[in-house]
Amino acid sequence: MMKNRVTNIHFVGIGGVGMSGIAEVLHNLGFKVSGSDQARNAATEHLGSLGIQVYPGHTAEHVNGADVVVTSTAVKKENPEVVAALEQQIPVIPRALMLAELMRFRDGIAIAGTHGKTTTTSLTASILGAAGLDPTFVIGGKLNAAGTNARLGKGEYIVAEADESDASFLHLTPIMSVVTNIDEDHMDTYGHSVEKLHQAFIDFIHRMPFYGKAFLCIDSEHVRAILPKVSKPYATYGLDDTADIYATDIENVGAQMKFTVHVQMKGHEQGSFEVVLNMPGRHNVLNALAAIGVALEVGASVEAIQKGLLGFEGVGRRFQKYGDIKLPNGGTALLVDDYGHHPVEMAATLSAARGAYPEKRLVLAFQPHRYTRTRDLFEDFTKVLNTVDALVLTEVYAAGEEPIAAADSRALARAIRVLGKLEPIYCENVADLPEMLLNVLQDGDIVLNMGAGSINRVPAALLELSKQI
């Protein structure tokens, strides 16, 4: 139906991770796709290389000829392209609604949760690929093995992230869903009510048909709390032997995790098998268990699961290793980049770094994301930031918010200093961070560059500076 009525699809804010992936898949399905964005980035360059028209900036003329206009939550109603589309009676729809349309073409597998969505979606796509199922995927980060965050496969499944930040995951109608965990984040969306947050995830699970299946992580307290209200078929996973799929004998082997998977899921052969996951961290064992559950449900073999996890090449900005960088005083430091910006994610990633490189001094460069999050989770940030060996804090990435008194990086630095363990270094401008880090780092260190904002540009700048040494 959509193919008969829609030819030209225009994306406002096409360079965003969620938007660019959907645009690429639609282009590969044969639609004429265009888009606009204020900033040029790797995603807009990639889309341009595919033949997609990407306009710099936003003007009303860009929507001329469009059958539908797709927007992300970052795009304001006053955007000239949105205004022009509405004046011309061109439908303006959120990104999630277009993702829901894509799920009409395939059987959808939607991965939700406060943390771990991107990694779990990527692991699921990797295993399904190893099983020869050739899935379509739309991921919030670049799947390193594919070199992109989206791909149109020939198989029957589409694997996609389901975004709870604006409750837009309630547009999706998957046949299978995953909830990796539930945490108190993006609470403005839910009126600062845990009950409303819980209900949104219950409603998301209930978007499946009666023959669908959800995979729910019982290591999450909030997930356990919603289980009695879930009326659609589900299986549980976790590190507890009461789960339908659980892991034991978890072992850190360098930057990999080795563990035994036990399956006691209804309708499946009971038993256990060993796997090696090609990424560090106990939290990633949980992400792998979710992907294993989905894979077993679609009929993937144990061999395909083992192959997909061992051959996993990671995701952009999820414990992404850049290798050793040269230091001005001699020696080298290992550079790792990560998107983590919530204290729970950060604690898991820092623990993974300690487990993978126990002998190294851990240096963290961190850019908080949003003043509201810094304010709401101030104590949690202080605790997790105090666990590293050296800390460089750059100013909060506002993401469109106005500054909030005592919810900035200077306040965090003061609070950490009072604890008496660390002397945080404050870097007001993120552009100065690469040079500052080179002066802080010592031979043999691991430096973790972390945050969801403009700090993502630091690794490239650091590598460039390092080459000049």
UniProtKB/Swiss-Prot annotation:
- Annotated protein name in UniProt: UDP-N-acetylmuramate--L-alanine ligase
Principal location listed in the UniProt entry: cytoplasm
| Localization per record | Cytoplasm
Pfam families to which the protein is assigned, alphabetical: Mur_ligase (PF01225), Mur_ligase_C (PF02875), Mur_ligase_M (PF08245)
Which processes are annotated in GO (biological process)? cell division; cell wall organization; peptidoglycan biosynthetic process; regulation of cell shape
Task: Tell me the pathway.
Answer: Cell wall biogenesis; peptidoglycan biosynthesis
Q: Which reaction does it catalyse?
A: UDP-N-acetyl-alpha-D-muramate + L-alanine + ATP = UDP-N-acetyl-alpha-D-muramoyl-L-alanine + ADP + phosphate + H(+)
What family is this?
A: Belongs to the MurCDEF family.
Function description: Cell wall formation.
Gene Ontology CC annotation, any one: cytoplasm
Residue numbers binding ATP: 113-119
Which InterPro entries does the UniProt record give?
Mur-like_cat_sf, Mur_ligase_C, Mur_ligase_C_dom_sf, Mur_ligase_cen, Mur_ligase_N, MurCDEF_pg_biosynth, UDP-N-AcMur_Ala_ligase_MurC
Enzyme kind, highest EC tier? ligase
Which SUPFAM superfamilies does this one have? MurCD N-terminal domain, MurD-like peptide ligases, catalytic domain, MurD-like peptide ligases, peptide-binding domain
Q: What is the lineage of its organism?
A: Bacteria, Pseudomonadati, Pseudomonadota, Betaproteobacteria, Neisseriales
* Documented EC number(s): 6.3.2.8
Q: GO MF terms on file? A: ATP binding; UDP-N-acetylmuramate-L-alanine ligase activity
Q: Which PANTHER family match?
A: UDP-N-ACETYLMURAMATE--L-ALANINE LIGASE (PTHR43445:SF3), UDP-N-ACETYLMURAMATE--L-ALANINE LIGASE-RELATED (PTHR43445)
Q: Which organism is it from?
A: Neisseria meningitidis serogroup A / serotype 4A (strain DSM 15465 / Z2491)
Q: Which UniProt keywords apply?
A: ATP-binding, Cell cycle, Cell division, Cell shape, Cell wall biogenesis/degradation, Cytoplasm, Ligase, Nucleotide-binding, Peptidoglycan synthesis
